Amino acid sequence: MDFHGTTVLCVKRNDSVIIASDGQVTMGNTVLKHNAKKIRKLYNGQVLTGFAGSTADAFTLFERFEGKLETYKGNLLRAAVELAKDWRTDKILRRLEALLIVADKEHILIISGNGDVIEPEDQVAAIGSGGPFAFAAAKALYDNTELPAKEIAIKAMEIASKICIYTNNIIITEELS
């Protein structure tokens, strides 16, 4: 059975970095949970993370990523690249189905199981089924308003929840400021 239902958005503006997700977990066409937490802080609260995909796979990747952060003393880029290398080459990790967004005060990165570590050109990134909708809304708000990162993230997530059936309007946020 396929699990769907995640939208994770990260916005950086001025000295604030915010990550937001919806709370819906769906199996097939059934909503199983409305308030799941798909985001967390790692490395003594200095790194934000969020996932789209299988929950068990995501937690495995969170643990691995946190280990890489410890090994590389909080160097987000190095930890992300090393995780992506492991994810791509390890026979067991290779089967994990998830995408991660990770961010610190300087960088926002998307990490995939294909070995990709992508730093968006803009200060906005999104993953998951509602990711394209949240990204478009956040980008429009970022480019055309002076709203703070948190307001942009919340408004964009609300818009995504009205378009994507796998995204709800119970929005959970974490912030670095």
From Swiss-Prot:
Subcellular location field: Cytoplasm
UniProt source species: Thermodesulfovibrio yellowstonii (strain ATCC 51303 / DSM 11347 / YP87)
Pfam families per UniProt: Proteasome (PF00227)
Positions of Na(+) binding: 161, 164, 167
Regulation of catalytic or functional activity: Allosterically activated by HslU binding.
Database matches in HAMAP family: HslV (MF_00248)
NCBIfam families hit by this protein: ATP_dep_HslV, PRK05456.1
Catalytic activity: ATP-dependent cleavage of peptide bonds with broad specificity
Signal sequence extent: none
Keywords: Allosteric enzyme, Cytoplasm, Hydrolase, Metal-binding, Protease, Sodium, Threonine protease
GO biological process: proteolysis involved in protein catabolic process
Protein's UniProt name: ATP-dependent protease subunit HslV
A GO CC annotation given for this chain: HslUV protease complex
SUPFAM superfamilies linked to this entry: N-terminal nucleophile aminohydrolases (Ntn hydrolases) (SSF56235)
Task of the protein: Protease subunit of a proteasome-like degradation complex believed to be a general protein degrading machinery.
Family: Belongs to the peptidase T1B family. HslV subfamily.
GO MF assignments: metal ion binding; threonine-type endopeptidase activity
Residues annotated as catalytic: 6
